[in-house]
């Protein structure tokens, strides 16, 4: 038992010595591994910002002749996390339009699961990129001398690539459904608009260009992480032995790694 405690203390002591040796080295940022990580960090910001910060509204024009001959605007406001079934229609303040309580009617659909999965994952990626860059730049020797850290980085990179594909695909499908649910189909779904005495016309809906951009950045992130997997793999023990065994046996100097 005592030898085991001694070994644990010794490992903790070595780790503490390495962690205390923080020294900024910007050279890793000039290599593909570090440079692509910076691009991943920036792309993740655009991914969650363009989706999570969206606010929009859809409008319909209503009249019911002969009581109301002038079109009145009824508006439903929606945004992230896109629980459309909680977005009720609102008439102008103090205006009774066709004796209908428009607040009782809402948009159709709940797309919060896809939207929140996408944004939450993008935020986690953002935080991981910060931690990875801190390790690359501040603890370069610790990363290069360790067998576990590059392997963990490699596994995380593969998982992140897959999750970018899954989350972006799910969000792209949800976005398509959101466009349908807030578009011209509103007229066909609203019960008051099915009455003969009430005439409804689709007005407008907020442009969803930023949401389209979020999907683009999602797939861009997937490409960046997938491409960076090779450079992370080169730092692992899975790749290094084949490159370092020959030079060592000949008494030469092993080739430099990606960092």
Swiss-Prot record:
Record: glycosylation sites: 71, 212
Q: Where in the cell is it found?
A: Cytoplasmic vesicle membrane; Melanosome
Q: Name one GO biological process term.
A: chemical synaptic transmission
Task: Give membrane topology per the record.
Answer: Multi-pass membrane protein
Kindly report every residue range on the membrane side named Cytoplasmic: 1-33, 138-150, 234-259
Alphabetic keyword roster: Cytoplasmic vesicle, Glycoprotein, Membrane, Transmembrane, Transmembrane helix
UniProt GO cellular component terms? extracellular exosome; melanosome; membrane; plasma membrane; secretory granule; synaptic vesicle membrane
Residue span, MARVEL domain: 28-237
Cite a single Pfam family from the UniProt record. MARVEL
Residue intervals passing through the bilayer:
34-54, 117-137, 151-171, 213-233
Indicate the principal place this protein occupies in or around the cell.
membrane
Q: Does the keyword Translocase apply?
A: no
Say yes or no: keyword Membrane present: yes
Q: Which ranges of this chain reside in the Vesicular compartment per its record?
A: 55-116, 172-212
To which protein family does this belong? Answer: Belongs to the synaptophysin/synaptobrevin family.
Q: What is this protein called?
A: Synaptophysin-like protein 1
- Its gene name is SYPL1
């Amino acid at each position: 038992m005592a030898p085991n405690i001694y070994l644990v203390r010794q490992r903790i002591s070595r780790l503490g010595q390495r962690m205390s040796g923080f020294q900024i080295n910007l050279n890793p940022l000039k290599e593909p591994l570090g440079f692509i990580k910076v691009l991943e960090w920036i792309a993740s910001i655009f991914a969650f910002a363009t989706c999570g910060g969206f606010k929009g509204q859809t409008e319909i024009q209503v009249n019911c002749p002969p009581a109301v001959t002038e079109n009145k605007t009824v508006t439903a406001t929606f945004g992230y996390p896109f629980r459309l079934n909680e977005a009720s229609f609102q008439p102008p303040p103090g205006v009774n339009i066709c004796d209908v309580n428009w607040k009782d009617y809402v948009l159709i659909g709940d797309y919060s699961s896809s939207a929140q999965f996408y944004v939450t994952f993008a935020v986690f990626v953002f935080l991981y990129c910060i931690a990875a860059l801190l390790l690359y730049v501040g603890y370069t020797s610790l990363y290069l001398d360790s067998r576990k850290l590059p392997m963990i980085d490699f596994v995380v990179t593969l998982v992140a690539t897959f999750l970018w594909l899954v989350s972006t695909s799910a969000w792209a499908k949800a976005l398509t459904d959101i466009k349908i649910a807030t578009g011209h189909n509103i007229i066909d779904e609203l019960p008051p608009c099915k009455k003969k005495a009430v005439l409804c016309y689709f007005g407008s809906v907020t442009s969803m260009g930023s949401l389209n951009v979020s999907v683009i950045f999602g797939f861009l992130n997937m490409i960046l992480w997938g491409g960076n997997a090779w450079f992370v793999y080169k730092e692992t023990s899975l790749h290094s032995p084949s490159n370092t065994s020959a030079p060592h046996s000949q008494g030469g100097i092993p080739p430099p790694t990606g960092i």
